């Protein structure tokens, strides 16, 4: 990539920093997660949570959601201008679970947003620490990616539900900045653009006037983000066409869907970061660990290390399998929802099962669920090896893949063949090949057809022992390629509902 020199690393995006060297990046990322940890400890004190209750992932999620809601300016403003019955725009809260007489009970708490903002700033040296907020958003997004399927959303925008491997970050709020944009999959960006174009088709004033100019800027910015994810000239050239269109309409939607499909073989670069629940950072800070001094990275050994010695609990519903709940959270912690299960299993050291076979629902408990029979268990979040997270899609080649998911988006930089089912994917490319983008389409299809199965991605990259923090001895695993590797295969998971 010619533009590599102008790119900021994702730690820089994450911490909003300008160009920094590796040590400065490690320090500023450390400062960010340390701030999250300090905030969490303070909140546990405010809410009077016991040590055990503070390690409950459901409590962590409630506290994270409270601070995100406290800083959601546009929604806060909207709530103040459009008061709705029974909703205090100045307050935020959620369910907190406490242990009483050997049982778990749910208690709804309510706090002033102002108070939450004060505690957050105090934990972050008086700053707004937007990077920390984005970090929490990405953790929630990774958890959603591992938990829910987006079939409905894909179908609504005219995309194929089997393209789910392109949907990383599809539930991230718009305000998640550069760090958020970096982790969004190609399908997510395409979906956002299609929604925008559809509004323009239905609403004549969408692109007009003062607001329309702002809309247009946003549209072009999103096109550029998506263009930057593609690794071939033809895909990028097509994105230029989409961006420069005078009046975006159905032709652009067609082009975008074509590009999304092409990304199943000619993969985009999508960043992956291990973002952990706030309680994990809280535990480390409470035990005296100084993140800023020690430095921290979201893409190296650090998150694996942290999970190796953190004990986090989760509420378990009566018929759920605690091991499966652990797998779900482990995948979320390492943003591995779209990774090949064989690679993840090797790193974790235990076999991961496809989502359709998981006996567990989401981590969060709905307000109408009965707490009587709820139990809690330790989440097993440790791993056997660690591996570097990738921001590239890997080079592209072919291998037998499943009916439920026809490609993967690699998370770990580990040598392997990347599976995709060529017949299924190529079948989608018959038909419409005229119009302005025909030569680019032809070129893209040619590249896809010539993608070779024997090509190995991430050549020579391997996993590392947890004692090998400098990544000196890569272990290149060999995978049983006859096996099924996709997580969303034969799926029956719940849909994501806002």
Curated annotation (Swiss-Prot):
PTM text: Late in virus-infected cells, may be cleaved from a 56-kDa protein to a 53-kDa protein by a cellular caspase. This cleavage might be a marker for the onset of apoptosis in infected cells or have a specific function in virus host interaction.
Span list, region Disordered: 1-21
Similarity remark: Belongs to the influenza viruses nucleoprotein family.
Superkingdom of the source species: Viruses
Gene behind this protein: NP
Subcellular location: Virion; Host nucleus
Role: Encapsidates the negative strand viral RNA, protecting it from nucleases. The encapsidated genomic RNA is termed the ribonucleoprotein (RNP) and serves as template for transcription and replication. The RNP needs to be localized in the host nucleus to start an infectious cycle, but is too large to diffuse through the nuclear pore complex. NP comprises at least 2 nuclear localization signals that are responsible for the active RNP import into the nucleus through cellular importin alpha/beta pathway.
Positions occupied by motif Unconventional nuclear localization signal: 1-18
Subunit and partners: Homomultimerizes to form the nucleocapsid. May bind host exportin-1/XPO1. Binds to viral genomic RNA. Protein-RNA contacts are mediated by a combination of electrostatic interactions between positively charged residues and the phosphate backbone and planar interactions between aromatic side chains and bases.
InterPro entries with a match to the protein in the record: Flu_NP (IPR002141)
Location, primary (coarse class): virion
Alphabetic keyword roster: Capsid protein, Helical capsid protein, Host nucleus, Host-virus interaction, Ribonucleoprotein, RNA-binding, Viral nucleoprotein, Viral penetration into host nucleus, Virion, Virus entry into host cell
Motif Bipartite nuclear localization signal mapped to chain: 198-216
GO molecular function: RNA binding; structural molecule activity
UniProt name for this protein: Nucleoprotein
């Amino acid at each position: 990539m010619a533009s590599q020199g102008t790119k900021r690393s994702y730690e820089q995006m994450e911490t909003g920093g300008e160009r920094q060297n590796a040590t400065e990046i490690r320090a500023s990322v450390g400062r960010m997660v340390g701030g999250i940890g300090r905030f969490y400890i303070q909140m546990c004190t405010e809410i009077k949570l016991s040590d055990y209750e503070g390690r409950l992932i459901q409590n962590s999620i409630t506290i994270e959601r409270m601070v995100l809601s406290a800083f959601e300016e546009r929604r806060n403003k909207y709530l103040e201008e459009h008061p709705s019955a029974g909703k205090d725009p100045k307050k935020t809260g959620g369910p907190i679970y406490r242990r009483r007489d050997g049982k778990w009970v749910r208690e709804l708490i309510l706090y002033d947003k102002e108070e939450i903002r004060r505690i957050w700033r105090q934990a972050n040296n008086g700053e707004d620490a937007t990077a920390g907020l984005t970090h929490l958003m990405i953790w929630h997004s990774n958890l959603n990616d591992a938990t829910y399927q987006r079939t409905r959303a894909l179908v609504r925008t005219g995309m194929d539900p089997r393209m789910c491997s392109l949907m990383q970050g599809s539930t991230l709020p718009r305000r998640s900045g550069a760090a958020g944009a970096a982790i969004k999959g190609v399908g997510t960006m395409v979906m956002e653009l299609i929604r925008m174009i559809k509004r323009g088709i239905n609403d004549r004033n969408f692109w007009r006037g003062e607001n329309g100019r702002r809309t247009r800027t946003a549209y072009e910015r999103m096109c550029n983000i998506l263009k930057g994810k593609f690794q071939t000239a033809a895909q990028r050239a097509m994105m230029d066409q989409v961006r420069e269109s005078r009046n975006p309409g159905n032709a652009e939607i067609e082009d975008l869907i074509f590009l999304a499909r092409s990304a199943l073989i000619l993969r985009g670069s999508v960043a992956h970061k291990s973002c952990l629940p706030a309680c994990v950072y809280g535990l480390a800070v409470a035990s005296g660990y100084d993140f800023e001094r020690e430095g921290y990275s979201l893409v190296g050994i650090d998150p694996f290390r942290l999970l190796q010695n953190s004990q986090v609990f989760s509420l378990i519903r009566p018929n759920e399998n605690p091991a499966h709940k652990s797998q779900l959270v482990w995948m979320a912690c390492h943003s591995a929802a779209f990774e090949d299960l064989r690679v993840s299993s090797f790193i974790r050291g235990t076999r991961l099962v496809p989502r359709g076979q998981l006996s567990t629902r989401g981590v969060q408990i709905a307000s109408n669920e009965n707490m009587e029979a709820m139990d809690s268990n330790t989440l097993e979040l440790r791993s056997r090896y660690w591996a570097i997270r990738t921001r590239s899609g890997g080079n592209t080649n072919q291998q037998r893949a499943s009916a439920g998911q026809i490609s993967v988006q690699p998370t770990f930089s580990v040598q392997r063949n990347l599976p995709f089912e060529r017949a299924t994917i190529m079948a989608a490319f018959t038909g419409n090949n005229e119009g302005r983008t025909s030569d680019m389409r032809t070129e893209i299809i040619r590249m896809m057809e010539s993608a070779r199965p024997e090509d190995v991605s991430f050549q020579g990259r391997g996993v590392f022992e947890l004692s090998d923090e400098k990544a000196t001895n890569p272990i290149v695993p060999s995978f049983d390629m006859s096996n099924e590797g996709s997580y969303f295969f034969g799926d029956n998971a719940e849909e994501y509902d806002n």
